[in-house]
């Protein structure tokens, strides 16, 4: 958000104490700035190792169908390898969770609360639904992926990606003295690469089907999960370029969140690495005082030069 107690003007990049502050500098305008700097440098030599296609697309943060998805479906996403710069520089990401948004609407019958026995309370009817979801949540979140988690999450004790089931919104009733005739629960399901989106939806549907509550269940599938072979030559090439450009050999990990890049990777089959300019526990993306280390920004430009130069 641009509102709030920013220490700097959010719509202008400002350098302070070795960091650059501004809205979106980490996620992910900083990566774009570094790319432009790298391309300027490469233009001086006139040689690159690859024929480049650069896609700067919109709407990744909202909805489940971004500009990258649109271009993919048009057949415009082509190539032998892809580098997605929407990430952190802690690790090279080769996997991510998928996301499904769900909505369960429990129906009842309204009445005056003084004679509530004449109605059917949809909020109270939703309690068994929530209990069934919480039971399924425990089962779902006991699973683990073979894809390692990020360095930041590993330091917190989470060694690999895990699926998630969340109830994040509830809406029911219009007034205290009216029996509610509707209660809507909303949430999401994070799908690890070993799961399928279809199976995850079927599992949730099966958990709620035995309940007596009159209910409508809807799914809104978003970005799919992604997994790239860690032994692919492109993965090694990216890691080695990071070592030359930024001075460290990065570990491989997965993103606990979801990426529109996964849609393009799934549809095209093009091997993909995700590597950006921010740091997961420092950059405060989507928050006040979003920032990136100046040294990381310059190092990322050097990484791109190392990756692309002939």
Where in this protein do the model-derived segments appear?
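Acidic, glycine-rich active-site loops and adjacent beta-strand->loop/helix elements
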Residues: 19, 55-63, 68, 85-89, ...
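Active-site alpha-helical elements of protease catalytic centers
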Residues: 24-39
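Short helix-loop-beta-strand segments that form the rim/entrance of peptidase-like active sites
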Residues: 39-60
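Midchain, well-structured core segments that form catalytic/ion-binding scaffolds
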Residues: 69, 73-213, 223
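Short, low-order "capping/linker" segments at domain edges
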Residues: 227-242
């Amino acid at each position: 958000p641009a509102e709030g107690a920013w220490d700097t003007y959010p719509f202008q990049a400002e350098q302070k104490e070795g960091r650059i502050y501004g809205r979106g500098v980490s996620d992910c305008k900083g990566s774009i700035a570094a790319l432009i700097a790298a391309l300027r440098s490469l233009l001086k030599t006139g040689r690159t190792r690859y024929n480049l296609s650069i896609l700067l697309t919109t709407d990744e943060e909202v909805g489940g169908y971004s500009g990258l998805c649109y271009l993919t479906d048009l057949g415009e996403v082509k190539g032998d390898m892809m580098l997605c710069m929407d990430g952190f520089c802690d690790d090279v990401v080769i996997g991510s969770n998928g996301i499904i948004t769900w909505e369960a609407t429990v129906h009842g019958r309204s009445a005056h609360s003084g004679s509530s026995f004449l109605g059917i309370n949809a909020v109270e009817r939703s309690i068994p639904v929530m209990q069934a979801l919480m039971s399924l949540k425990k089962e779902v979140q006991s699973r683990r992926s073979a894809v390692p988690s990020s360095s930041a999450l590993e330091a917190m004790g989470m060694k690999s990606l895990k699926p998630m089931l969340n109830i994040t919104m509830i809406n029911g009733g219009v007034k205290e003295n009216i029996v509610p005739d509707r209660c809507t629960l909303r949430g999401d399901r994070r799908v690890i690469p070993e799961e399928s989106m279809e199976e995850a939806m079927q599992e949730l549907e099966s958990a709620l089907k035995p309940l007596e509550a009159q209910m409508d269940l809807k799914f809104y599938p978003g970005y799919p999960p992604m997994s790239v072979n860690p032994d692919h030559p492109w993965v090694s090439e990216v890691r080695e370029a990071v070592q030359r450009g930024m001075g460290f050999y990065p570990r491989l990990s997965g993103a606990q969140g979801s990426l529109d890049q996964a849609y393009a990777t799934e549809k095209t089959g093009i091997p993909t690495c995700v590597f950006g300019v921010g740091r997961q526990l420092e950059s405060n993306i989507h928050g006040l005082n979003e920032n990136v280390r100046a040294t990381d920004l310059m190092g990322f430009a050097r990484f791109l030069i190392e990756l692309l130069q002939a």
